[in-house]
Structures are given as structure tokens and as C-alpha cells.
Regions:
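Disulfide-stabilized extracellular recognition modules
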Residues: 76, 84-145
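Short, glycine-/polar-rich solvent-exposed loops and beta-turns at beta-strand/coil boundaries
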Residues: 35-37, 61-62, 109-111
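Surface-exposed charge patches
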Residues: 22, 67, 105
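Short, surface-exposed glycine/acidic/tryptophan-bearing loops
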Residues: 39-88
């Protein structure tokens, strides 16, 4: 599933990377680098959720986030994922995650070192926008934010 070029983040995806790192800094956590493999995984998942109009950590192939990240080349043991739908912008989506008792601890996990971000749009969906952020505890190939 790997390609020769790095994934390209749009303006809001880049804003999300910066916002997650700012949130972590507010809580004394180190910044995360942007992982190529995790970004590919997150982008694929956001598109899969949008395509199927389904907000779920299990993808259309029946994989959980751990299996999917493995398939995209991120095989390190420490992993996490947050997903959201309904907002096009990073600030509103991060606010959803920060308010969630399940997602907030993942964003602030001390052992994390890298992240990957993806968002996708389905104009036919009531949600319209779907977001995925994948996280890992081992630095592999990274790219600039």
C-alpha cells in the first residue's frame, strides 16, 4: 500500500497537527511528529468512513485500527486512534475529541511519538466530513507538518 511520495495534507489537516501538538503542550506532553505510514492509514480510514457513510473504528474490510495500521506499514506495538464526523475544520473537530472521555486520554498519552491525520468528505452524508487521527509510540519515517 505504500507509495513513493509522501501523502499531502490539506490546510485543515495541517491545522489539526498543529492544534494537537498545542493541546499536548498545554498539558506538558511532547509534540508529535507526522508519520508517513500513519498518515496513509488515517487518510484511507477517513475516505473509507466517508465512502460508506459510517463512523466506526472498524473499516469496511473488517479491520480494527491496529490491523489497518499494520497493513499500512506501521507495526509498532503502541497505537491509538480517534475518529470524528460532522465538522470540516480542525478546531471544531479537536473540540469534539477534547470533550470526549474516550478520545481525550489518547490525545494526551505520554508514550506517543507520532501521528497521522486524514479527513474526507461525502456531500451526501448527514455528517459530510469524516476525520481520523492515528497515533503511535515509535518514530518511523516522518514528513514535515
Amino acid at each position: 500500500m505504500a507509495t513513493a511520495t509522501n501523502p499531502r495534507l490539506d490546510t485543515q489537516e495541517k491545522a489539526m497537527c498543529r492544534a494537537i501538538n498545542a493541546f499536548r503542550a498545554e498539558h506538558g506532553k511532547p509534540p508529535l511528529k507526522l508519520s508517513v505510514a500513519l498518515t496513509r492509514s488515517a487518510e484511507w480510514m477517513a475516505k473509507d468512513m466517508a465512502r460508506h457513510d459510517n463512523l466506526d473504528h472498524a473499516d469496511s474490510k473488517g479491520r480494527d485500527f491496529d490491523e489497518r495500521m499494520d497493513d499500512f506499514g506501521y507495526t509498532a506495538p503502541t497505537k491509538g486512534e480517534v475518529i470524528a464526523a460532522g465538522h470540516s475544520d480542525a478546531a471544531s473537530t479537536l473540540a469534539q475529541w477534547k470533550a470526549s472521555p474516550l478520545h481525550r486520554p489518547i490525545l494526551l498519552k505520554s508514550r506517543l511519538k507520532v501521528m497521522g491525520i486524514g479527513r474526507a468528505r461525502n456531500v451526501s452524508s448527514d455528517f459530510e466530513w469524516f476525520w481520523t487521527a492515528d497515533f503511535g509510540g515509535t518514530v518511523t519515517k516522518t514528513m514535515p507538518i
